[in-house]
Amino acid sequence: STSTSTSDYSAADRAELAALSKVLAQNAEAFGAEALARMFTVYAATKSYFKDYKDFTAAAPSIKAHGAKVVTALAKACDHLDDLKTHLHKLATFHGSELKVDPANFQYLSYCLEVALAVHLTEFSPETHCALDKFLTNVCHELSSRYR
């Protein structure tokens, strides 16, 4: 698909994502730091984009700060399901043109965020997982769009 359309999200997906976005916003630092720390452990090559970082654990101030930034951006993107392309354009350009991040890394971080949420949320139903996976797939697609 070339962009996210309204039809990509059912009413149930939208309800799941609206609830999840609140949880993400309230716990951005904790979930973000854990997701990044998991990514740096499981996909060690991703560390190459963070040359100034010495500590890649979830307790590191730099990991907490970047994790909070990422998860806050994802929570805000949940409010723009019908126009992710426009909403994420600046971030896509920054990551694609300036940072030149390998687009595969967006998917790696998505996997790690899903694991972190599944571990910590008591209400992480298959329906929540499905809606989140659909959303993160669309976010990854849009963030990768400035490479082409």
UniProtKB/Swiss-Prot annotation:
<keyword id="KW-0349">Heme</keyword>
<dbReference type="GO" id="GO:0043177">
    <property type="term" value="F:organic acid binding"/>
</dbReference>
<dbReference type="GO" id="GO:0020037">
    <property type="term" value="F:heme binding"/>
</dbReference>
<keyword id="KW-0408">Iron</keyword>
<comment type="subunit">
    <text>Heterotetramer of two alpha chains and two beta chains.</text>
</comment>
<dbReference type="GO" id="GO:0031720">
    <property type="term" value="F:haptoglobin binding"/>
</dbReference>
<protein>
    <recommendedName>
        <fullName>Hemoglobin subunit alpha</fullName>
    </recommendedName>
</protein>
<dbReference type="GO" id="GO:0004601">
    <property type="term" value="F:peroxidase activity"/>
</dbReference>
<keyword id="KW-0007">Acetylation</keyword>
<dbReference type="GO" id="GO:0005344">
    <property type="term" value="F:oxygen carrier activity"/>
</dbReference>
<dbReference type="GO" id="GO:0031838">
    <property type="term" value="C:haptoglobin-hemoglobin complex"/>
</dbReference>
<dbReference type="InterPro" id="IPR009050">
    <property type="entry name" value="Globin-like_sf"/>
</dbReference>
<dbReference type="InterPro" id="IPR050056">
    <property type="entry name" value="Hemoglobin_oxygen_transport"/>
</dbReference>
<feature type="modified residue" description="N-acetylserine">
    <location>
        <position position="1"/>
    </location>
</feature>
<dbReference type="GO" id="GO:0019825">
    <property type="term" value="F:oxygen binding"/>
</dbReference>
<feature type="binding site">
    <location>
        <position position="66"/>
    </location>
    <ligand>
        <name>O2</name>
    </ligand>
</feature>
<feature type="domain" description="Globin">
    <location>
        <begin position="8"/>
        <end position="148"/>
    </location>
</feature>
<dbReference type="GO" id="GO:0005833">
    <property type="term" value="C:hemoglobin complex"/>
</dbReference>
<comment type="function">
    <text>Involved in oxygen transport from the lung to the various peripheral tissues.</text>
</comment>
<dbReference type="InterPro" id="IPR002338">
    <property type="entry name" value="Hemoglobin_a-typ"/>
</dbReference>
<dbReference type="Pfam" id="PF00042">
    <property type="entry name" value="Globin"/>
</dbReference>
<dbReference type="GO" id="GO:0042744">
    <property type="term" value="P:hydrogen peroxide catabolic process"/>
</dbReference>
<keyword id="KW-0813">Transport</keyword>
<dbReference type="GO" id="GO:0072562">
    <property type="term" value="C:blood microparticle"/>
</dbReference>
<dbReference type="GO" id="GO:0046872">
    <property type="term" value="F:metal ion binding"/>
</dbReference>
<comment type="similarity">
    <text>Belongs to the globin family.</text>
</comment>
<feature type="binding site" description="proximal binding residue">
    <location>
        <position position="95"/>
    </location>
    <ligand>
        <name>heme b</name>
    </ligand>
</feature>
<dbReference type="InterPro" id="IPR012292">
    <property type="entry name" value="Globin/Proto"/>
</dbReference>
<keyword id="KW-0561">Oxygen transport</keyword>
<keyword id="KW-0479">Metal-binding</keyword>
<dbReference type="InterPro" id="IPR000971">
    <property type="entry name" value="Globin"/>
</dbReference>
